[in-house]
Amino acid sequence: LPYPVNCKTECECVMCGLGIICKQCYYQQ
């Protein structure tokens, strides 16, 4: 799935509350 441009990587995008926010990955792919 596409992710917000302010996210460096797809795994940084995390669903939170009403939308998607950027967070660090808790794991490596």
Swiss-Prot record:
Tissue expression summary: Expressed by the venom gland.
Chief location of this protein within or outside the cell: secreted
Taxonomic superkingdom: Eukaryota
Intracellular or extracellular location(s): Secreted
PTM annotation, UniProt: Contains 3 disulfide bonds.
Keywords: Disulfide bond, Secreted
Family matches, as SUPFAM superfamilies: Scorpion toxin-like
GO CC annotations, alphabetized: extracellular region
InterPro entries hit by this protein: Scorpion_toxin-like_sf
Miscellaneous section: Negative results: does not show any effect on Na(+), Ca(2+) currents, nor on voltage-gated and calcium-activated potassium channels.
Protein name as catalogued: Neurotoxin BmK A3-6
Source organism of this protein record: Olivierus martensii
Organism lineage string: Eukaryota, Metazoa, Ecdysozoa, Arthropoda, Chelicerata
